[in-house]
C-alpha cells in the first residue's frame, strides 16, 4: 500500500507532539520525586530621592608669573566660598582643596622649545551638603559667579543617596521573596513545593534615574538625577520537596 505524500508530514508532527509530551511528563515526574532543586532570580526596586549633593567648582587663574597665578586662584576660591555661604550653605559644608599648577611651555612648529611662557593654577572648591535643592538652584545659574569676576568653572552637581547601605538588606529580603514566588509558580504546576534555600548569589545594585531601563553587568550609579530607582537582584537556589 502506497503512502500519500501528505500523510508523512502529519505523521512526523504527531510523533514530535508525543515526544514533547513524554519529555514534559518526565520533567514533571523528576520534580515530584523530590531531591531536585530550582534556581531563580528575584528583584526588588525602591524609589528614592537623593539626600546628598556634591558640587565641585574649579577656580582657574593664568599668569606668566607662577606666584601671581597662585594668588589669583586662591583669591577666587575665597570669593567663591564667601558667595556659597551668602547663598545659604554652611561653611562646614565647603572644602577648599590644595591648588594644582600646570606649566605652559612655548611650542614652535609642533615642538616644545623648553621656554616657560606661563602658569595655570586651579583651586577646587567642593560642596558636600544635604541641601540638594539649594545646590540645584545655584548650579542652574553659573553666570552669577562669573558676573562677580570670579574665574570659575563649575562642574555638574552629583546627586547621591547616602542611606543606600541601610536599605540594601531590606531590598535583598524583598528580592528573595520575589524569587520564592517565581519558584512556586514554576514548580506548583508539577504538584511540588518549594523547600529550603540551598544557595544564594547576590547580584550588583543598579541605581538609575527614575523609570530608566538601563542596566550594567557591573552595576551602575546615576549621579545626574535627583529622583532615582534602586534595584537589588538576587539569585536563589531552592530545594524542591
Task: Give the ranges of each region predicted by the language model.
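Short, charge-dense linear interaction motifs
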Residues: 1-241
